Structure formats: C-alpha cells, structure tokens
Amino acid sequence: PPEPDLMKRKPRNPRTGTTGQEAWYHPKRITFDFVPPWIAEMGTDPSNGRTYVKRGLLTSRDSLELFDKFLPDPDHPARYEQVARWIEKYREDYAVFARIRLGGASTFESMGLDVFSIMMYDDPDLVKEIHRRFSEWSVRVVQHLNKMDFDFIWANDDHADTKMPWVNLEMWEEFMKPYQMMVAREIRKPWIFHSDGNLFPILDGLLTLGMNAIHPVQPSAMDIDTLKQKYGGRVCIV
C-alpha cells in the first residue's frame, strides 16, 4: 500500500471555523490493517467507490475450502517488513496502532447473517469451525504484532445494530467467546474493542475478553451515562 498521507493542509470551514486538523477532530494517529478479507462476493457502490458484501460464501461444509483461496499467509514477512519501517519513521510523532479482528465480524460477513442464524441450529459445528479458522488466523497475526512497536491494538468486530446484538449472551458464549478469547489472550499490548450498535445485552460477556477500552458508544444505540455508571470502573470508554 502507499505510504500514509499525513495531515494535508485543508482550508478552514466557513461555517464551523475549523480546518478538520484540530487535535480533537483529527488526532495524530496512523492505522495499519491486519484484518482477514471477507470470504464473500463483493460489490462496489458506483456513487462513492465503496465496497460492500453482496453475499457471504461460507454457507456449507464444502465451502470451507475457500479459506485456502481467500486468506493470505499470516506469517509472510512481507506483511510486516514495510510496516516496521513506517513505524520507525512515524511513531515519535503519532500514535501508531494495528487493526485486527477477533473473528466475529469475519464470521458474520462471510456467512451472511441469515445463513449464520440458520446454521446455529442446523449445523452449529460449522459455525464454530468457521469462527475458529478466522480466529486462529488472527492469533498468528497478533503473534507478529506483539514483536512490533505498535502503541496499541484495535480489534474491529461489529456485533450489533442500533437495537440489539446479533446474538444473545448465551449464544455469544457458546459460538463466539471460545475463539475470540484465543485472540484476546494472545494480545500483549493495550487494546480497544470496537463495535457499533447496542452492546448492553452482551457487554458483561465481552468484557471478560480483557480489553482495556471499548469504542465507539453509538449515541443512537447506547446511553453513555448508563454505560459510565455501570461499567466506567471496569473499562475505559473511548
């Protein structure tokens, strides 16, 4: 990937009086992604060029062979060598972090929420096998990241929409926690767990993963005062 484009000067917004470069708005940080690709058919929005998942491809036991086709070698040195040079160059002035996944979002997106939900009942072992494979891939990535000079790790795994999580706490503990815990236990740096949506119904379970902070506290889904009162003494709220 190209070298990060750092803080280009922007004109001041006449309405807000800001440039978009203020510390509160655009903190000095650089992200490097170490996430597995979706095993899915992808589409592109012509209006903005964004990619999105059209449909997941992990829908049966036969489809497990797609892991070998889609997932790159997590131990290949090329994944880390250039990043190490960038870290050395920028870390004195910027907070440098690595973005990973614990395996939950990869499972949801690569199966599709509809197939995921059906298979929890029709073939629960398939759901667990898919999550395990994604999580084991991330474990190997994290083992390399631990040796690098990152300031912290960012685990990006959406588990909910604005109304509720996509699984209840009992389902999360059976189908997801064992594999996400594999990754969490491997992390040797401070780390943040990210998920949009309403996490309240499963948050007690999620916190057992041992993250240092949670993000983003979506205002339309979670009341920050309630969150602070109940959990502020247990985890940093970012």
Regions picked out by a protein language model, each given a short descriptive name:
Residues 1-44, 49, 55:
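N-terminal accessory beta-strand-rich subdomains and adjacent acidic, glycine-rich linkers
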Residues 45-238:
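Active-site loop segments of alpha/beta catalytic cores
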